[in-house]
Regions:
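A glycine-rich helix N-cap at a beta->alpha junction
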Residues: 76-110, 114-117
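Histidine-anchored nucleotide/phosphate-binding helix
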Residues: 40-53, 58
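A short aromatic-anchored loop/beta-hairpin motif
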Residues: 119-128, 133, 142
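Short, glycine-rich nucleotide/cofactor-binding loops
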Residues: 28-39, 68, 109-112
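Short internal beta-strands
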Residues: 56-62, 133-136
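Glycine-rich loop at the start of a catalytic domain that most often binds anionic cofactors/ligands
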Residues: 68-78
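Positively charged, low-complexity intrinsically disordered leader regions
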Residues: 2-19
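Glycine-rich, aromatic-bearing surface loops/beta-hairpins
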Residues: 147-174
Length: 174
């Protein structure tokens, strides 16, 4: 059974983890990209899995750290440069104002469909029972500690530890 929450930051749907159809299912999502357009796929999939009652873990590594770094998580960018899916001439992507314009347009489009910004989306995922993990190697490479990361990150762990925590999970690399 699901319930609707009056709290805007709480999940709209609270999953029923007692559903026999999802019992024992796990999803592990590796978030390795730090651009606005690549931040959302992992979060959307995590949110969907949690809504189905599936145990969900996100592992932020390499540029994916931008999503959980307190200094950068509110300022992820979207660039047209090198992105053929935008169907625009590549030369336009190099113009100084183009990244700001593309980022603004994407943020507006995301907001129009009711998807929260990155920090609120992470909060919603955690409130729904999701687990957030930071990669030890990436933290060390960037000289970051837990104090630098989004408060709901459960810990900085090694890739081996993540594999152990998510044993038997379906794995998605984004």
């Amino acid at each position: 059974m699901t319930t609707t929450s009056p709290d805007a930051l709480a999940p709209a749907v609270v999953p029923n983890f007692d559903d026999p159809a999802t019992e024992g299912r796990k999803l592990a999502i590796i978030c390795s990209k730090g651009t606005l357009d690549m931040a959302y796929p992992g979060l959307v999939l995590a949110n969907a899995a949690l809504g189905e009652g599936i145990e969900t873990h996100l592992f932020f590594t390499f540029w994916g750290f931008e999503m959980i770094n307190k200094k950068t998580m509110n300022d992820l960018q979207f660039t047209l440069l090198g992105n053929p899916a935008t169907h625009m001439p590549q030369g336009l992507g190099g113009l100084p104002w183009m990244t700001a314009m593309a980022t603004s347009k994407l943020k507006k489009s995301i907001a129009e469909v009711g998807v929260p910004e990155i920090p609120e989306f992470l909060e919603q995922i955690v409130a729904s029972g999701g687990h957030l993990w930071a990669c030890r190697m990436s933290a060390d490479m960037n000289h970051l500690t837990e104090d630098d990361l989004y408060d709901q990150v459960e810990g900085i762990i090694s890739a081996s530890d993540f594999i152990e925590k998510t044993e038997g999970a379906q794995l998605l690399f984004i």
